[in-house]
Amino acid sequence: MLSPQSLIELIQSHLTDAQVEVQDLTGSGDHWQAVIVSSAFGGKSRVQRHQLVYQALQSVLATNELHALTMKTLTPEEWQQSLSQGS
């Protein structure tokens, strides 16, 4: 079972400036939702952003320790904009 802190640390190991919030959707530690804010996402498409995150998670995906991840990937500027819009 993957802990929230382990998931955050895995993501931050590849996206060192990332601010990460995670939520276990099922209580089983294998279905997660994440909001990830990183300057590394600048100029990248949604698919490219998700690929960066999946690179960080290869080890737990390969072992099925992580089965599903829903994510929102934002640059710091996009995050600030979403806060000001109340979303």
What function would you assign to each model-found segment?
Residues 55-87:
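C-terminal structural segments of small proteins and small subunits
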Residues 23, 35-37, 72-74:
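Solvent-exposed beta-strand sheet faces enriched in polar/charged residues
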Residues 33-48:
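A short interface-forming secondary-structure element
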Residues 31, 50, 67:
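Histidine-centered active-site/metal-ligand motif
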Residues 7, 11, 49-64:
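Short, non-transmembrane amphipathic alpha-helical segments
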Residues 1-18:
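N-proximal, solvent-exposed amphipathic alpha-helical segments enriched in charged/polar residues
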Residues 17-33:
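Short edge beta-strands and adjacent turn/loop segments
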Residues 27-29, 41, 77:
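Short active-site-proximal "capping" loops at secondary-structure junctions
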